[in-house]
Amino acid sequence: MLNLPFKALADPTRRKIILLLKERDLTAGEIAEQFEITKPSISHHLNVLKQAMLVTDERKGQNIYYSLNTTVFQEVVKWFFNATHVNEGGLGDVKNAKDK
């Protein structure tokens, strides 16, 4: 389940989009204003973030607003927390973690 979010977060442009959306919901045009890349490139990055379920979109009138999906971010943070803390289970936990 977490492969797509990690892959999406590997790109610096997508990480910057995430930081922008942390502040408030934005349209694709508002996001594009913060970059020196084409609108189709921004659209591609937004689609990757949507496929990874890190971002959702909602139509309001003629605009589509993008927002963070905090549920998936909670799962990513939970994975990092579990991966960085040693448990009593030892290496058995590593075998279980790779299956998730």
Where do the model's predicted regions map?
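Helix-turn-helix DNA-binding motif, specifically the short coil turn and the N-cap/start of the second
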Residues: 27, 38-41
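Base-recognition residues in the alpha-helical recognition helix of bacterial helix-turn-helix
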Residues: 19, 43-47, 62
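Beta-hairpin "wing" of winged helix-turn-helix
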Residues: 50-60, 67
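Amphipathic alpha-helical dimerization/coiled-coil segments
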Residues: 1, 74-100
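Pre-recognition alpha-helix immediately N-terminal to the DNA-recognition helix
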Residues: 15-17
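Short capping segments at the starts of secondary-structure elements
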Residues: 23-29
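Alpha-helical residues within the helix-turn-helix
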Residues: 33, 44, 50-51
